[in-house]
Amino acid sequence: RTGVASGNKIFGAAILRKSDLSVIVAAANDETANPLWHGEIHAIKKFFELPSHPAPADCVFLCTHEPCSLCLSGIAWSGFDNFSYLFSHADSAMSFAIPYDIAILNAVYAVPDPDRSGPAPGRDLYNRSNDYFTSTNLMPVARAQLPDTVDRLHALYAELSAQYQARKGTGNIAMA
């Protein structure tokens, strides 16, 4: 809420200990301070600024939304071997009116097959399991086991997104 009230997008992340799922750091987008401080990147920054911290491979990386290309790279370069998210790229675009993740992944990374002008329809935008990390979409399990909680979270993020959308363009954020 504080980040959105400051003019930032609705994304956030937390880094937890794998051993007990306790929170090590949590962060929200802070693009008004620096356009690179996406929730995940800001969490990584805070994690490595700690005087001591567990090895990234001993952590769970939790994202409110599926990471963009910047954050995917940050997670890989930082040594986190996993991340989980609740809202997908499609959710960000369709439910929260923030389409840039899909647009950038398609424009920059989606290399078309030689026999077509664009990438194959429905092709994943990144390798969800690769040499660097494995990603997990939490929504199917959350929706099945905690439908009321998911509905409340979706409503909260829709409200925060509406607040952000009403104010976007008044700050100094690229791709607002």
Residue ranges and their predicted role:
Residues R1-G3, S78-A176:
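Zinc-dependent deaminase
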